[in-house]
Amino acid sequence: MKLEDFDFELPEDRIAQHPVEPRDSSRLMVMNRWTGEIEHRVFRELPELLQAGDVLVVNNTRVIPARLIGEKEGTQAKIECLLLTRRDKDVWETLIKPGKRLKAGQTVVFGDGLLRGELLEILPDGNRLVRFNYQGIFEEVLDQLGNMPLPPYITEQLQDKERYQTIYAKESGSAAAPTAGLHFTPELLERLQDKGVEIVEILLHVGLGTFRPVKVENVEEHTMHSEYYRVTPDAAERINRAKSQGRRVIAVGTTASRTLESVAGENGRIEGKEGWTDIYIYPGYTFKILDGLITNFHFPKSTLVMLVSALAGRDQILKAYQIAIAEGYRFYSFGDAMMIL
């Protein structure tokens, strides 16, 4: 398969620059992946579209304000540091700009010395390992000094940091939001549970590799970034019970779907465990757990478009995207949603 097989023309005015209010007023395209039939709904109507017994699997990661601006120690040279992945208690894999300004052993000072970062190592892919020194609790220091790492295609300033968090976000560690979850409100979750829909939480800390362009012509040759996940034994048991009873398991977002497929055995059961996954899902992949997916509209030639194409078929997805563009759906992180069943 060629990379251009997943390309399409997206007008710039279809890229959502800010979220809609309230969260569940976003539009929802519903696709039957077996027939290709498409329905246009609103996200708050989700309880009408699901059945009692369905399981929604959500990713409860929390985005950290991962973009830090500091100065190289002893100079006034500005350094931008983007936290990507925690590798140890105080050691992070980061993206440093401009990278040439900082050599191993040198230090960046943030917030008048409230936080200091020492460059330990330059990794083969150009990312940097940095050890941080600080007083108090790292997350609190980060909240004080850091900015939300909004995707590069969002050029408007975010007024409310919480708007780039899901309402069920718990454990800090992501460099980007699991954006399919941004459409949920507390009231909508309550209505879903009243309907008999089961909500199961799992964790995957989203890395910025999500936004990295695929640079190979043959999609099979692409290598995915690695991300930390955790599925508790209780979550695994609830999902396995649903599968054994013939109930549908629907992932909220590509991160939840990748986590589920990472812990799935050939027997169609999952086990509770934690670790790192670099699972890469593209057409030809056979899903072991997923019966459906709620996701946003993704950018051309991305691994995310490949994943939804693996579930619903490339031709059907590209056709649905053309309809979405013509109908004025909003794309990307703050955009509208699609449910594939």
UniProtKB/Swiss-Prot annotation:
Enzyme group, top EC level?
transferase
Q: Give the highest taxon in the source lineage.
A: Bacteria
Q: What EC number(s) has UniProt assigned to this enzyme?
A: 2.4.99.17
Under catalytic activity, the entry for this protein gives: 7-aminomethyl-7-carbaguanosine(34) in tRNA + S-adenosyl-L-methionine = epoxyqueuosine(34) in tRNA + adenine + L-methionine + 2 H(+)
The residue stretches assigned to a coiled coil in this entry are none
**Pathway the protein acts in:** tRNA modification; tRNA-queuosine biosynthesis
Where located? Cytoplasm
What InterPro entries is this protein classified in?
QueA (IPR003699), QueA_dom1 (IPR042118), QueA_dom2 (IPR042119), QueA_sf (IPR036100)
Which Gene Ontology cellular component terms are annotated?
A: cytoplasm
Q: Read off the Pfam families from this record.
A: Queuosine_synth (PF02547)
One GO term of the biological process aspect: tRNA wobble guanine modification
Question: What does the record give under GO molecular function?
Answer: S-adenosylmethionine:tRNA ribosyltransferase-isomerase activity
- Where this protein primarily resides, as one coarse class? cytoplasm
Entry keywords, A to Z: Cytoplasm, Queuosine biosynthesis, S-adenosyl-L-methionine, Transferase
Please report which protein family the annotation says this sequence is part of. Answer: Belongs to the QueA family.
HAMAP family, A to Z: QueA
General function of this protein: Transfers and isomerizes the ribose moiety from AdoMet to the 7-aminomethyl group of 7-deazaguanine (preQ1-tRNA) to give epoxyqueuosine (oQ-tRNA).
Oligomeric form and interacting partners: Monomer.
Q: What is this protein called?
A: S-adenosylmethionine:tRNA ribosyltransferase-isomerase
Q: Which organism is it from?
A: Desulfitobacterium hafniense (strain Y51)
